[in-house]
Amino acid sequence: MFVENLKETINLGSKFAKQLNPQSIVLLKGPIGAGKTTFVQGIAKGLSITEDITSPTFSLSHHYRSGEIPLIHLDLYRLENVSSAREIFFSEEEEAIQRQAILIIEWPELIEPFIQNFWKINIGYAKNYGRHYEIRDPKNLLTFS
């Protein structure tokens, strides 16, 4: 699916949020600046979260509790080894289970082999401008492209 601008990215994220349930896991992949956090802002909008959504690159995770379903936003970009990434992921996953939250993970490459039953979103730069989104459901079926 082609997305031309920030507004369309927010709208796509908001629509996508309606597919999610408590304890859904979403893996977000894409290069730096592709719009991963903007897409998460759209998901938060779709969940009626009123807090400002910012990138958790330096803090590793942000927790949002004001919406219909709580949201945990994890960013593993700064982590360099699998054991650290796994430790943080499993801790945040436990929190998501306890709070019935959705867990969204940016830069999930180190932990993807250890996770089952997740949504996978690949964001890429389109040829001249905009972004291309490929969204796969937990059964690995293409839902948007």
Segment roles from a protein language model:
Residues 17-23:
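Phosphate-binding P-loop
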Residues 83, 91-145:
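Short phosphate-coordinating micro-motif centered on Lys-Gly-acidic
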Residues 1-15:
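N-terminal pre-Walker A segment at the start of P-loop NTPase domains
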Residues 26-28:
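Hydrophobic anchor at the beta1->P-loop junction of P-loop NTPases
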